[in-house]
Amino acid sequence: MSNFFTNVLRYPLFLISFSLGIFLTFFRWIEPITKKPLNLIVLIISFGTVLMFLNLTFKAMLDLN
């Protein structure tokens, strides 16, 4: 039974390390772009636009008006 709990506890650790790895990889790719203020502003606006689009799409798909 203790082996079961050991296996169950591995999955959250895997999820955390996987998510952190994706974030760090993405941040290192974006870091040179953020050196110029104009690029940073465009990046933030683009990210916000994508989040708003996904939010509106999911609300429409799930009928959450």
Curated annotation (Swiss-Prot):
GO terms for cellular component: cyanelle. It comes from the Eukaryota. It is found in: Plastid, Cyanelle. InterPro entries: Uncharacterised_Ycf33. Keywords: Cyanelle, Plastid. Belongs to the ycf33 family. This is Uncharacterized protein ycf33. It comes from Cyanophora paradoxa. The lineage of its organism: Eukaryota, Glaucocystophyceae, Cyanophoraceae, Cyanophora.
